[in-house]
């Protein structure tokens, strides 16, 4: 297999979990499809397919043949889906109002005026508009599925109401059939139309509630401007956002949303990036600085050279990531899918069995009892409650996480997070600000003129975070000019060595001292101990076997780190800190934060090995880092959590991304995962219990005990309430 493409398409005309199952089966049968899944809550098909064997148009054709539709055009896809859903909601609203206009007088005739002349005929006339105009879609959809040898909730509604209606029509025009057998001919028009009215009402409430579950993603989409102002041949021109191209010059005025990712080519301003990074203070932007789509220009006008447009912006990636996460399936969903796949056929069998048993043991009213019980079984059964249980909880949980600047990759990550019992934190950039500065220098007694030039040149070539602090101090503060080096070599996990005018110089951690057989003078050693005891990181600079300088580098602990550690402990999670710094520095930092366990002098391989050791002890490990010196440990951990501001490549590979530098997001993420998974289990429990209890009661299992026989009208109300209650329960998470 080659050229695998993964895409998500909005699905139209789905009415229940059975519909979602049918669409999924249809797409999976297509040649070239690697995998497909349908999320009923989001009305989305996620499909991986071989692009050289299949096109989106062919996928849509197959879905159309199954009675549904796809939006495959990329342009304004979300807007078209929202428009279709709004149109469907308005149609449902008209159907509900129209149905109840006829149902209310129908109930009057069936319960109060049943003895007036032509009561049955009047009820028939009132029932016809409900059956044909307002509930007609149930029969059309059920027939379409039957032709494909499939079934869904429409099948149950169509069968139950048709049986009640046709039986009533027969009794209206041929009452003698029953009179001749000494029986009273009953009509159940009210049952048929009330079932339709209740089901439509339930669907209307369900659609409204489902719409509320996608609030977070709509807010993110609202950050995308529709129009951009481009500069072409010196003339400003307004164009649609999807017409922008990489390299375009985009003009942004004060108060406007930035439409593209790019860098300032003219002007300067302050930009509000809180919607992306969560940082509340506007960030100063000058020529050459990067800006992101969706952020807001505060003051001056400027021109951006676009580097990311449309689906390539950071905002678009965030939206795509949240959508994919909301559309992913929790491990437990596989069981639910199997149940919903056979649900309707099983219910049909139970209804037939109920009818037969009542005919055999039903007594004098055997036929009416058999009919009503079979109809009640068909009506009360609800695959929608099962189908909505997991995806609605995921939508709300992952959406709430996104609104809190926490990006969760998928449902599996959410499930894994609640099992975590050890969090491993990389010190630099995670517990600390990640903006190291030189806090002290101590040079050996003999300092040659070119030493700082060599040190600057070496650190300019280094990728280590601490190198930037030395570069800033020498280049920007002391205005040192870098020397011309003859060679450069990186020593993994230790530092670097360079050659200048035939001499070998080295910069790095204390591990390099052993490599070069170098030792500290008493003065340098004493100062090094003082620096480390204050929590500073130490960088050594030497030539051959001689240590030339000790540089102390401070990286301030984040204001929220100690509180985050305390909150994680409250949740029962053990915490370990990993750092490449020495023992004294690690002890000083861990003491300030209340972390009991740490590993100092840790190389990237050591961090990976530490995570592996924890896993061998049976621990579920979450690794939190910035992806610089901890990528191996992040990859190995059960849950990988990246610290970033939405611009990191770590966002693509980590299971969870904290979009701001606030470490309090970490315990919040774990809390949200536990709440969401708990909600999924609650929803599934009640959905299963509802069907396990409701179907036997509808079949008449309590009749021998207390004479209770469930009216089909009450059964339809219970069915409508079951799926609505699942969605409302999911929405309760948004209020926590």
Language-model-detected regions and their locations in the chain:
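Conserved cytosolic catalytic loops of P-type ATPases
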Residues: 32-53, 57, 189, 218-312, ...
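Conserved ATP-binding TGD loop and adjacent catalytic N/P-domain core of P-type ATPases
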Residues: 4, 21, 500-502, 542-682
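Membrane-embedded alpha-helical bundles of multi-pass transporters
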Residues: 112-115, 147, 166, 400, ...
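Conserved catalytic phosphorylation-site environment of P-type ATPases
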Residues: 276, 372, 382-458, 614, ...
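Transmembrane helix-loop-helix hairpins at the membrane interface
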Residues: 91-227, 338, 441, 710
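Flexible metal-binding regulatory segments at protein termini and peripheral loops
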Residues: 1-122, 219, 235, 316, ...
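Juxtamembrane coupling segments of multi-pass membrane pumps/enzymes
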Residues: 8, 80, 179, 193-254, ...
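Signature of the cytosolic headpiece of P-type E1-E2 ATPases
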Residues: 466, 475-588, 603
């Amino acid at each position: 297999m080659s050229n695998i493409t993964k895409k998500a398409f909005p699905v139209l005309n789905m009415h229940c979990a059975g519909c979602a199952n049918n669409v999924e089966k249809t797409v999976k049968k297509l040649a070239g499809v690697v995998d497909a899944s349908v999320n009923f809550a989001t009305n989305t098909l996620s499909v991986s397919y071989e692009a050289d064997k299949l096109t989106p148009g062919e996928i849509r054709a197959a879905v159309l043949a199954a009675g549904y539709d796809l939006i495959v055009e990329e342009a304004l896809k979300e807007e078209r889906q929202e428009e279709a859903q709004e149109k469907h909601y308005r149609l449902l609203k008209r159907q509900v109002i129209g149905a109840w206009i006829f149902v209310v007088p129908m109930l009057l005739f069936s319960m109060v005026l049943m003895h007036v002349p032509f009561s049955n005929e009047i009820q028939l006339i009132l029932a016809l508009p409900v059956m044909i105009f307002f509930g007609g879609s149930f029969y059309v959809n059920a027939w379409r599925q039957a032709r494909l040898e499939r079934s869904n909730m429409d099948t149950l509604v169509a069968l139950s109401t048709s049986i009640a209606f046709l039986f009533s029509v027969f009794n209206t025009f041929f009452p003698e059939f029953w009179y001749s057998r000494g029986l009273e001919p009953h009509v159940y028009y009210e049952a048929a139309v009330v079932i339709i009215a209740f089901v439509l009402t339930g669907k209307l409430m369900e659609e409204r509630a489902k719409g509320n579950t996608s609030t977070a993603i709509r807010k993110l989409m609202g950050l995308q401007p529709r129009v951009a102002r481009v500069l072409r041949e010196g003339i400003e021109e307004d164009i649609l956002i999807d017409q922008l191209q990489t390299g375009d010059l985009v003009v942004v005025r004060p108060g406007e949303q930035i439409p593209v990712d790019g860098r300032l080519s003219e002007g300067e301003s302050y930009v509000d990036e809180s919607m992306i990074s969560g940082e509340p203070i506007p960030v100063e932007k000058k020529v050459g600085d990067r800006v992101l789509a969706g952020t807001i220009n505060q003051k001056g006008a400027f021109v951006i050279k676009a580097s990311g447009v449309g689906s390539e912006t950071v905002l678009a990636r965030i939206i795509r990531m949240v959508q994919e996460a909301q559309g992913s399936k929790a491990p437990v969903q596989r069981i639910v899918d199997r149940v919903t796949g056979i649900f309707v056929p099983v219910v049909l069998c139970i209804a037939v069995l109920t009818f037969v048993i009542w005919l055999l043991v039903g007594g004098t009213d055997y036929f009416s009892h058999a009919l009503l019980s079979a109809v009640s079984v068909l009506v009360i059964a609800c695959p929608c409650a099962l189908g909505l249980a997991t995806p609605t909880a995921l939508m709300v949980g992952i959406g709430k996480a996104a609104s809190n600047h926490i990006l969760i990759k998928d449902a599996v990550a959410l499930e894994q997070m609640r099992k975590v019992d050890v969090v491993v934190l990389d010190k630099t950039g995670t517990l600390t600000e990640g903006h190291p500065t030189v806090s002290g220098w101590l040079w050996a007694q003999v300092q040659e003129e070119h030493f700082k030039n060599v040190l600057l040149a070496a650190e300019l070539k280094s990728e280590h975070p601490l190198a930037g602090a030395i570069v800033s101090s020498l280049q920007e503060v002391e205005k040192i000019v870098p020397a011309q080096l003859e060679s450069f070599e990186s020593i993994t996990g230790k530092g670097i060595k360079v050659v200048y005018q035939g001499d070998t110089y080295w910069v790095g951690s204390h591990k390099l001292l052993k490599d070069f057989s170098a030792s500290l003078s008493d003065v340098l050693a004493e100062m090094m101990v003082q620096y480390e005891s204050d929590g500073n990181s130490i960088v050594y600079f030497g030539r051959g076997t001689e240590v030339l300088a000790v540089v102390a580098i401070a990286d301030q602990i984040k204001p929220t780190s100690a509180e985050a550690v305390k909150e994680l402990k409250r949740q029962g999670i053990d915490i370990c800190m990993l750092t490449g710094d020495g023992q004294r520095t690690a002890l000083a930092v861990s003491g300030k934060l209340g972390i009991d366990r740490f590993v100092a002098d840790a190389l990237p391989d050591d961090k990976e090995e530490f995570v592996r050791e924890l896993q061998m002890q049976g621990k579920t490990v979450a690794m939190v880092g910035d992806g610089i010196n901890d990528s191996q440990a992040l990859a190995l951990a059960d849950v990988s959590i990246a610290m970033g501001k939405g611009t990191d490549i770590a966002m693509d590979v980590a299971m969870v991304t904290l979009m701001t530098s606030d470490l309090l997001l970490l315990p919040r993420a774990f809390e949200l995962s536990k709440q969401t998974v708990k909600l999924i289990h609650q929803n599934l429990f009640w959905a299963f219990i509802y069907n396990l209890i409701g179907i036997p009661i509808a079949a008449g299992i309590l009749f021998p005990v207390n004479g209770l026989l469930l009216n089909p009208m009450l059964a339809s109300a219970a069915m409508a309430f079951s799926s609505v209650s699942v969605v409302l329960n999911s929405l309760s998470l948004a209020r926590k």
